Amino acid sequence: GQDIGDPITTNTPWTGGIVDKSWFTAPGQAKYRAPGNVKVPFWLQPETYYKGAAWYQRDIVLPESWRDQRVVLFLERAHWETRVWLNDRFIGSNDSLSTPHEYQLGVDLPPGKHRLTVRVDNRMVVDIGENSHSISDHTQGNWNGIVGRIELRATPKAWIDDLRVYPDVAGRTFRVEGVIANAQPDGKLQTGRMALALQRWHAADQTRISPPVKRLAFPVALGTEKATFGWSIPSGDLAGLETWDEFNPVVYQLTASLPNGSSRTVTFGLRAFGVEGTQFTINGRPTFLRGTLECAIFPKTGHTPTDLESWRKVFEAARAHGLNNLRFHSHCPPEAAFQVADELGMYLHVECGTWPNQSTTLGDGKPVDDWLERETDRILKAYGNHPSFVILLHGNEPGGDRHVAFLKKWVERCLANDPRRLYSGGAG
């Protein structure tokens, strides 16, 4: 840490429940409760503890080449809520625990100096369950800040906002769907052609295997605020595509490009994960998940890593023990974890960051209900193309008299929105 906050005492307002009162009452533990000699036995103890808002401010300089471009602030992983201002103008807020926080700073910003302000708040802005590994002090810790990539990006005013690939394993092909957004729509229906380039992707060294498998082009509309598109690629155009599984983790990259230079690239694999009777199946064949928990336990840093090598170490250790599956207990990993899992053929069970049973409940109209719906959509948009992403749950051990009905509808909505994986109402 940075020695910010208050010294640790018996009254430190930890995030997470404590079920053993002996440290607070037992005579034999008295010396470890004394001021200046506090030793917390439940989890790794920071030197100081801070829960609240932290403010970050700096001047940024936009180059002349960004004139008339859409400028975006990208924060890969924040904990927890961020709020952003540019030149004292409030831009917005974001409360995702699982996905990048992205802010459109403007579409007509003049080149030159601007003042950027970011506020990060690690208090429980929504009660999603005090013991959730996404927020609690039990494992990674209730840290405050931003990790991973912190970037300013410039794009054309019309850009590809979403790109999804739906594999058809039986037909050895796929369907492409997405959204084109326009920051300054003129109301006129403009048409253009979107180019698609498909390539094998060598995940281990992050390189494309040339030449492209296929290049295709399709008509699109550009003049409206939001324009959706979708095409099923004829199987005859995609001869030789291989399926993805733990034994043959073949990964492809699809790049979609607009005439104005905007492009978006996604990684995917040709795979189908399902159920037959009481068994999981991969590409129509029965499989067995040999797994373990990953509970956001990273004691050296106190937060989930965002680099490839850290996750390669985690997954290779699992594979060395004969495992092919990790359950991310009440949290969701960042992009790097999915990339490495794609590469190594690991099956990931991801959760939306909740453990709603001690301090809150599901299905009772509490703020966690709405937050879960929004976080689900954000996770599916950010990571849904990865073939390793085979299972999604809301979180751990749901509580509340109405949680069964609520989660039944949640599963149904998820399947309707994105049928590329399995969904369930909970795990224990």
Predicted regions and their residues:
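Substrate-binding/catalytic cleft of secreted carbohydrate-active enzymes
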Residues: 325-428
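Secreted/periplasmic carbohydrate-active enzymes, especially glycoside hydrolases
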Residues: 1-328, 340, 345, 375, ...
